């Protein structure tokens, strides 16, 4: 190495190592600033952090309470829904039973009307047949009597009275015979 470089190296100090008096002053300033921050700023920071922690814990408690209440409301809703379904089912069964009873009563009424109409028709047909039979029997009896006697029985009024009286006697005998059975 050249002697000049050696002299220059000795005269130059290392730029990375600060001088000792600056280092002491910087360290004292750091302790003062750190002490000030620890006394004034750190309690405020701790206070804000504590408030935040309490708010979070309170929010969690509120959320848990809300969740518990929501679960309770949900269970009440389910119970009410089940009760409403049960009531609806019972009401539908009652309405169905009522409808069936009404339909049976209506069917019974219609059946009785049909039977009554059938009996009335049979009675009317019986009367019509009896009337037609009475006329035919009257004609046959008159003709037969005319053939037996040998002369014509022309008096219709008298003839009708005799035939009606005879047939009424037959009806009375038939009615008493049926009543004694």
Curated annotation (Swiss-Prot):
Pfam families: ATP-synt_B. Disulfide bonds: none annotated. GO terms for cellular component: plasma membrane; proton-transporting ATP synthase complex. GO terms for molecular function: proton-transporting ATP synthase activity, rotational mechanism; proton-transporting ATPase activity, rotational mechanism. The chain crosses the membrane at residues 16-36. F-type ATPases have 2 components, F(1) - the catalytic core - and F(0) - the membrane proton channel. F(1) has five subunits: alpha(3), beta(3), gamma(1), delta(1), epsilon(1). F(0) has three main subunits: a(1), b(2) and c(10-14). The alpha and beta chains form an alternating ring which encloses part of the gamma chain. F(1) is attached to F(0) by a central stalk formed by the gamma and epsilon chains, while a peripheral stalk is formed by the delta and b chains. This is ATP synthase subunit b. The gene is atpF.
């Amino acid at each position: 190495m050249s002697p000049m470089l050696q002299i220059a190296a000795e005269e130059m100090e290392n730029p990375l190592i600060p001088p000792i008096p600056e280092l002491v002053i910087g360290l004292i300033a750091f302790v003062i600033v750190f002490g000030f921050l620890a006394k004034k700023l750190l309690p405020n920071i701790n206070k804000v952090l504590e408030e935040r922690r309490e708010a979070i814990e309170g929010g969690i408690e509120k959320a848990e309470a809300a969740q518990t209440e929501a679960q309770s409301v949900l269970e009440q809703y389910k119970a009410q829904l089940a009760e409403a379904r049960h009531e609806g089912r019972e009401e539908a069964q009652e309405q169905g039973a009522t409808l069936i009873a009404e339909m049976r009563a209506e069917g019974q009424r219609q059946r009785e009307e049909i039977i009554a109409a059938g009996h009335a028709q049979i009675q009317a047909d019986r009367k019509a047949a009896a009337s037609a039979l009475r006329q035919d029997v009257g004609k046959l009896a008159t003709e037969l009597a005319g053939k037996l006697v040998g002369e014509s029985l022309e008096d219709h009024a008298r003839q009708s009275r005799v035939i009606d009286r005879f047939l009424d006697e037959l009806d009375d005998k038939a009615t008493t015979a049926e009543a004694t059975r």
